[in-house]
Design a protein with these regions (language model features):
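His/Asp/Glu-enriched, well-ordered alpha-helical/loop segment
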Residues: 4-32, 46-132
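A generic structural signal for well-ordered coil/turn residues at beta-strand boundaries
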Residues: 124, 150, 170-171
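C-terminal cap of metal-dependent C-N hydrolases
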Residues: 51-58, 63-64, 128-165
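Intein/HINT protein-splicing elements and their conserved insertion hotspots or analogous self-processing inserts
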Residues: 164-172
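Short, small-hydrophobic-rich alpha-helical interface motif
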Residues: 1-2, 158
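Short, flexible loop segments at the rims of nucleotide/cofactor-binding pockets, characterized by
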Residues: 37-40, 107
Length: 172
């Protein structure tokens, strides 16, 4: 059993308690023992900082989460639905239209993806159809592998995505 399996899902503080070490020492040991091959889920971001980032004109919404281990970040399964359900629909912190723009056309433009992010002739038809009142993010730190709710259809390159088949050229 590798070290990461033994500690998967535990916080650095919990591992420090088990190993009777300081948290910083635990992090260094884990990095060394796993040849830098660890993943860390940080959930301590200040909500006000996140709000300011999302509101900022240059702020784009994305996730760098990966499916690593049994306890990936809950945002792996709910970054975009969290923006739609909480930030736009419930808290009205950002308009739905602006939130979608910050998740689609703005990043595509900034990254130079010329046929992505907008619904136009000769563009890739990448579309998510959702039922706004039903959009929900059940993923939590303790139970992160929960699919978002309220997403009715996902269309990538003009094809309906079924059974997680990877349709996009960048995903193949």
């Amino acid at each position: 059993m590798c070290i990461r399996d033994r500690y998967d899902g535990l916080s650095v503080s919990e591992i420090a308690g088990i190993k009777k070490q300081e948290p910083a020492e635990v992090m260094f040991d884990l990095l060394l023992d796993e040849n830098l091959g660890i993943s860390y889920v940080g959930l301590g971001a200040n909500p006000q900082t996140l709000h300011e980032f999302v509101k900022h004109e240059a702020g784009m919404i994305a996730s760098d989460s990966i499916l690593f281990g049994a306890h990936p970040s809950p945002r792996t399964f709910g970054t975009f639905t969290k923006i739609i359900s909480e930030y736009a629909r419930d808290d009205k912190f950002i308009t739905l239209e602006r939130g979608i723009m910050k998740m689609s056309s703005f990043p595509a433009q900034r990254l130079g993806l010329k046929s992505k992010g907008l619904i136009l002739d000769d563009y890739d038809a990448d579309i998510v159809v959702f039922d706004l009142p039903k959009v929900n993010v059940p993923a939590t730190k303790s139970n992160p592998r929960q699919l978002s709710e309220g997403i009715e259809h996902v269309i990538v390159n003009g094809s309906f995505v079924i059974n997680l088949f990877l349709m996009g050229w960048s995903l193949r």
